[in-house]
Amino acid sequence: MRATPQLSVVVPVHNEEDNVAPLVGEIVAALRGLVDFEIVYVDDTSRDSTLERLRDLQATTPELRVIRHLSNAGQSTAVRNGVKAARAPWIATLDGDGQNDPADIPKLIAERAKAAPEVKLFAGWRVNRQDSGSKRWASTWRIKRAAVLSQQ
């Protein structure tokens, strides 16, 4: 790993003890040998063993960095703090619950390589999501609320 990675993968987590090891493994499998990268996990004061499992993973995953909030601040703040801590010029974000496939990151990297220099953002669109009904309802509500507030 270079002193300054080319890509930072930011992953906010809260109570994801069963998901951190598989997701770290998937990120490493997708990126190691392709690009110099770091993985920045931001633990938003998990009450389970998420932090301990991340610390254990650091022993075998040199790309892994772990940041912990002192108090619960929410997913958006965790992403923001992860981005601020990132050392690479390019940043990918993944949800800590495994809903995003790290294998898609190389596809975005390939598109970036073909793009004009003025292009600064690459994004994917998830299909066949596995979200619960309550999560879909909450997402829809937040989007509609933001739309109403932006018109005021």
Regions found by a protein language model. Give the residues of each.
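N-proximal low-complexity "stem/linker" segments adjacent to membrane-targeting elements
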Residues: M1-A29
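Structural signature of the Rossmann-like NAD(P)-dependent dehydrogenase/reductase core
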Residues: S8, D43-S46, R68
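Donor nucleotide-sugar binding loop of glycosyltransferases
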Residues: E16-N19, S46, Q75, D101
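Acidic helix N-cap motif at the loop->helix transition within catalytic regions
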Residues: D18-P22, D48-L57
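Conserved hydrophobic residues forming the short capping helix/wall of the S-adenosyl-L-methionine
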Residues: A30-L31, L54-Q58, R112
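Conserved donor nucleotide-binding strand/loop of the catalytic core
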Residues: D36-Y41, L51-A85
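A conserved acidic beta->alpha catalytic loop
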Residues: D43-E52, G98
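Acceptor/aglycone-binding surface of glycosyltransferases and processive sugar-polymer synthases
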Residues: H69-A85, W90-T93, Q99-Q152
